[in-house]
Amino acid sequence: MLARTLVTPRLRLEATTPAHADGLWTATESSLSQLLVYMAWAPQASPENSRSYAERVAKRFDESIDWSFTVFHDDVVAGAISLMNYEAMFKVAEIGYWIRSDLAGRGLATEAARAVCDFGFDEVRLHRIELRAWVENAASIRIAEKLGFTREGLLREASWAQAGYQDMYIYGLLESDRKAAK
């Protein structure tokens, strides 16, 4: 049985359930102008879509397809983080995250990502975690570097959001990289 709650010094990450939908919507709404820049789903954000998202990812967690967590800081929803696009045959998943704008710059996304990478390697038994970051997203690039991810290449026009198609860097972290860094 996989852990459904991860605790770090400043955060509590709970496997996302429909009970988190309202908090996720509040966090999304408060950060919508920033999320629109990088997140393709942001233009469709709404209370109804937050509920639908929470229901969908809760089911996928239970089915060991994806693992999505709602991030809490001081008992307030601070954002979301997921291991997604799981390829069971190769033991590979991609990490994605966002933190509400008023909490940005405090290292919370790095702290949450470290906990989820540990969960991925220790509990899901992943071999590799991938991270994709827009080339202009300096904050996400810093997170990848702090966690020991290796930049492996450039994906041309691989993502779309409000600004149109954008290039992305792809990073990889192997379980052996993590062990070597400890």
Please tell me what each predicted stretch does.
Residues M1-G23, A27-Q34, S68-K182:
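Acyl-donor (CoA/ACP) binding surface of acyl/acetyltransferases
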Residues S33-E55:
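Conserved GNAT-fold acetyl-CoA-binding loop/helix
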Residues Y38, A42, S64-S68, H127:
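Short, polar/charged, Gly/Pro-enriched helix-capping and turn/loop motifs at alpha-helix termini
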Residues A45-P47, F61, R178-K179:
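A short hydrophobic/aromatic micro-motif that marks alpha-helical segments and, especially, helix-coil
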Residues E55-T70:
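A short helix-loop-beta-strand connector motif used in the catalytic cores of GNAT acetyltransferases and
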